[in-house]
């Protein structure tokens, strides 16, 4: 187009240099973390979402409106794995919204709390949004992750507080309180899922590996526990996960 042809003339740059500059803008190792975190999130959404929800429900299911609170907690945990709001609302909201509607929660509230909780994904590290921002501005992605921890936790607490308030005000249903033995069994079953955000964030903040390396570790860990621990994913499922991740990326 004419605008494309006039761009190098306006900047007194030859086309070769312009092409190099365009490539240099995308030539960042930090950006490699994005497809890896998306892939890890998609793998885990097929495997561990139910585990995270089950653990959350085991501890707080006895509170009125507990499913809304479980949605917030599970979204925070899943956000610490995928770094994506879309993946979070798809994985967690896709499970908890139908469950809330089945227990006669107002449909608008169920959709709203799941949507709001999903924004924890782009805030709580490893946030894909922060990876892109750091790549563009040259700011350390690890420092961005560290700076987003407190805002993410505060937002999760605000959402949890509102879920508690709404549940008590509207007398929403609660589940039976679990015994310590039942809670221990649920945690034991889902402990591998809980370890994933610990490995990712602990490795980054502990200086063990970079955000990009942590994303690769997350994919390997997700594959290992999905295929060999929980055994709830097949190679056929992996193919569809790879396609979905490519589209999302």
Question: What are these model-predicted stretches?
Answer:
Residues 1-249:
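Alpha-helical transmembrane segments of multi-pass membrane transport proteins
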